[in-house]
């Protein structure tokens, strides 16, 4: 029951943020799916469908914004080229801060040492 509430919360958050950022970027998208992915925070299909990991609702809002912008940027560039990151940076100039947070959290969660910075969790 709790997981279902998390997924509903995630659907609401990602639906609102995708609509907002899609207008800023000047792109459209298909459907939004909320998933429990083990290795991804989000993805964008070649048809423009967006998938987001519901666990992101526990991340700082800036990180959620980054994932949404990252996936929507794929509607302009279906790769991780310089042009892709230029799209991301045009909306979120400090996106590298959010990328680092995500990388650090993943290392923390899956590390054998379990040495995590208190600011991450």
Protein language model annotation of sequence segments:
Residues 1-66, 75-121:
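Active-site-proximal or metal-binding-adjacent scaffold patches in catalytic folds
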């Amino acid at each position: 029951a709790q997981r279902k509430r998390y997924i509903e919360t995630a659907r609401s958050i990602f639906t609102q943020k995708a609509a907002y950022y899609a207008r800023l970027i000047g792109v459209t998208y298909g459907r939004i799916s909320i998933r429990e992915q083990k290795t991804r925070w989000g993805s964008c299909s070649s048809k423009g469908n967006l998938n987001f990991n519901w666990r992101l609702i526990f991340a700082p809002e800036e990180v959620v914004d980054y994932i949404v912008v990252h996936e929507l940027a794929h509607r302009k560039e279906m790769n991780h080229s310089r042009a892709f990151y230029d799209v991301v940076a045009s909306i979120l100039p400090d996106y590298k801060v959010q990328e680092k947070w995500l990388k650090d959290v993943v290392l923390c969660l899956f590390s054998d040492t379990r040495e995590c910075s208190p600011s991450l969790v």
